[in-house]
Amino acid sequence: MALNSLSLSLQFGKFPDAALHRAALPRHSVARWIRHALQSDAEITVRIVGAEEGQALNRDYRAKDYATNVLTFDYTQAPYVTADLVLCAPVVAKEAQDNQKTLQAHYAHLLVHGTLHAQGYDHETGEEDAEEMEALEIEILAGLGFDNPYR
């Protein structure tokens, strides 16, 4: 299977335990995970942030005053995907621990999830859409060697 091209910018904000998150996110892995979720060529920025920045972005752009695991800012979907994916490191780490997943497996899931959002998939528009998106995530992650993230 030929994968779509990806121009990737990987950024890390300043936050406690940043080195742990950098180690879990080698650039080649992040690119591989995203490329497997792409249905067209893309330019994507991935930014890993601390709780304060994550909360500010969620508050400012979604009117929800808490840090969330992943935010997707999609600018174009066709013929070329352009998007920013912002992942909040402390939230991702807590969720991984709570769900007994490795940090890397949870990041892979959230990057696939965010990449699908960037292409127009939305699990919040109805049960059928949620099932379609989850099925795609499970299939993509299985192809990457990760377990079903919803178990």
UniProtKB/Swiss-Prot annotation:
<dbReference type="InterPro" id="IPR020549">
    <property type="entry name" value="YbeY_CS"/>
</dbReference>
<feature type="binding site">
    <location>
        <position position="123"/>
    </location>
    <ligand>
        <name>Zn(2+)</name>
    </ligand>
</feature>
<keyword id="KW-0479">Metal-binding</keyword>
<dbReference type="InterPro" id="IPR002036">
    <property type="entry name" value="YbeY"/>
</dbReference>
<keyword id="KW-0255">Endonuclease</keyword>
<keyword id="KW-0862">Zinc</keyword>
<keyword id="KW-0698">rRNA processing</keyword>
<comment type="similarity">
    <text>Belongs to the endoribonuclease YbeY family.</text>
</comment>
<keyword id="KW-0378">Hydrolase</keyword>
<feature type="binding site">
    <location>
        <position position="113"/>
    </location>
    <ligand>
        <name>Zn(2+)</name>
    </ligand>
</feature>
<dbReference type="Pfam" id="PF02130">
    <property type="entry name" value="YbeY"/>
</dbReference>
<keyword id="KW-0690">Ribosome biogenesis</keyword>
<dbReference type="GO" id="GO:0006364">
    <property type="term" value="P:rRNA processing"/>
</dbReference>
<dbReference type="GO" id="GO:0004222">
    <property type="term" value="F:metalloendopeptidase activity"/>
</dbReference>
<keyword id="KW-0540">Nuclease</keyword>
<comment type="function">
    <text>Single strand-specific metallo-endoribonuclease involved in late-stage 70S ribosome quality control and in maturation of the 3' terminus of the 16S rRNA.</text>
</comment>
<protein>
    <recommendedName>
        <fullName>Endoribonuclease YbeY</fullName>
        <ecNumber>3.1.-.-</ecNumber>
    </recommendedName>
</protein>
<dbReference type="GO" id="GO:0004521">
    <property type="term" value="F:RNA endonuclease activity"/>
</dbReference>
<dbReference type="InterPro" id="IPR023091">
    <property type="entry name" value="MetalPrtase_cat_dom_sf_prd"/>
</dbReference>
<dbReference type="GO" id="GO:0005737">
    <property type="term" value="C:cytoplasm"/>
</dbReference>
<feature type="binding site">
    <location>
        <position position="117"/>
    </location>
    <ligand>
        <name>Zn(2+)</name>
    </ligand>
</feature>
<dbReference type="GO" id="GO:0008270">
    <property type="term" value="F:zinc ion binding"/>
</dbReference>
<keyword id="KW-0963">Cytoplasm</keyword>
